[in-house]
């Protein structure tokens, strides 16, 4: 029974990742969409490692929180990725310069965006009564995901974008509009 449930989770995660990647590719450049999508398993995986230490099990409530914060996980990576790409294309900066300056340029808004969400969930950690432990599942799930997302979007994602090099240029050739004669 447990093995079947785990297999269903894996299958749903794989389908979900494919759908997210397709959706991101529809609106972002393929290279940025790929690296943004890779932030999801990193953020979720990091949180999954912490959940047992925090006394949280994988259940309907914790799974719901993974879905709730998915948009935030993707948003901060999109902001960083697109800004790095913008500097690389519009300002003609090299990989390293566009990555460092592009990340630093948006790091503060990304940080405060995540911080405000954490602050919203934090009071639920202190709820008393019979339902207190149930409500604590929400912040104990959301906060680690958001922290790992912040770390991923400001360190791991820029490192990938910096070393994208030839892959980035290859994608650029096939995603940029061709000049008209």
Model region roles, listed by residue range:
Residues 174-181:
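Conserved small/polar residues in nucleotide/adenosyl-binding loops
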Residues 2, 6, 81, 87-112, ...:
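Helix-loop junctions and hydrophobic alpha-helical segments within the transmembrane domains
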Residues 18-81, 85-86, 144:
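Hydrophobic transmembrane alpha-helices and their membrane-interface caps
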Residues 1-22, 123, 134:
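Juxtamembrane "pre-transmembrane" interface segments
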Residues 85-90, 159-170:
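Juxtamembrane helix-loop transition segments at the membrane interface in multi-pass membrane proteins
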Residues 5, 20, 37, 41, ...:
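Residue-level signature of catalytic and energy-coupling elements of molecular machines
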Residues 21-27, 46-61, 111-162:
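Hydrophobic, glycine/alanine-rich multi-pass transmembrane helices and their short helix-loop junctions
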Residues 8-16, 102-113, 138-141, 145:
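Loop-to-transmembrane-helix entry motif
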């Amino acid at each position: 029974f447990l093995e079947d449930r785990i297999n269903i989770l894996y299958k749903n995660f794989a389908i979900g990742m494919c759908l997210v990647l397709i959706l991101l590719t529809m609106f972002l450049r393929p290279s940025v969409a790929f690296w943004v999508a890779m932030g999801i398993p990193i953020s979720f995986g990091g949180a999954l490692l912490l959940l047992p230490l925090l006394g949280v099990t994988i259940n309907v409530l914790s799974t719901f929180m993974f879905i709730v914060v998915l948009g935030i996980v993707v948003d901060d990576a999109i902001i960083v990725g697109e800004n790095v790409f913008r500097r690389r294309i519009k300002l003609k900066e090299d990989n390293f310069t566009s990555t460092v300056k592009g990340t630093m340029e948006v790091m503060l808004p990304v940080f405060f965006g995540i911080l405000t969400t954490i602050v919203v969930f934090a009071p639920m950690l202190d709820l008393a009564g019979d339902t207190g432990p149930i409500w604590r599942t929400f912040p104990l799930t959301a906060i680690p995901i958001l922290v790992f997302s912040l770390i991923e979007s400001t360190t791991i994602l820029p490192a990938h974008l910096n070393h994208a090099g030839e892959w980035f240029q290859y994608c650029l050739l096939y995603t940029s509009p061709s000049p008209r004669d």
